[in-house]
Amino acid sequence: MSNVVHVDDKNFETEVLQSEVPVLVDFGAAWCGPCQRQLPIVEKFATDNGNVKVCKVDIDDAPVVASKLGIRGVPTLMLFNEGKFVGSKVGLTSLAEISNFVLTKTG
C-alpha cells in the first residue's frame, strides 16, 4: 500500500485537511469483510490517480475522527478538497464508481 497513507486521530488534520491536493479517505475496520474487499480497489485507484491523495483510516485506530465525521457504517469513502468535505459514499464501491465520484466532486 505504498500509495495509500495510513491516517489516525493524530495525523488526520495534517494529512487530509491541510493537503494541497484532493484527498480520498477510505474509512474501514480490520473486522469488516466489505472493507477488506474495498482495500485493493482503493489501492488501484491510488496507483492510477497520482493527482489525488488517498488515505486509509481504521475507525478503531481513529475513534475521534470517525465520531467527529459521523461515520456510521464502513466502508465509507469521504472526499476532501482544499480542506473541506465535498462528498461521501457508503458501502463497497467499484473502481469506476470511485473514479466518477472523485471526478464529479473535484472537476
Residue ranges and their predicted role:
Residues 4-23:
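A short beta-strand-turn-helix
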Residues 6-8, 27, 39-64:
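Thiol-based oxidoreductase modules, predominantly thioredoxin-like and allied folds used
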Residues 20, 28-31, 73:
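Short pre-active-site segment immediately N-terminal to redox-active cysteine/selenocysteine motifs
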Residues 23, 63, 69-78, 96:
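Structural micro-motif
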Residues 24, 42, 75-88:
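A short, hydrophobic beta-strand/beta-hairpin element that forms part of a small beta-sheet core
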Residues 32-35, 77:
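The canonical Cys-X-X-Cys-His
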Residues 81-107:
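Non-catalytic, surface beta->alpha helical segment in thiol-disulfide oxidoreductase systems
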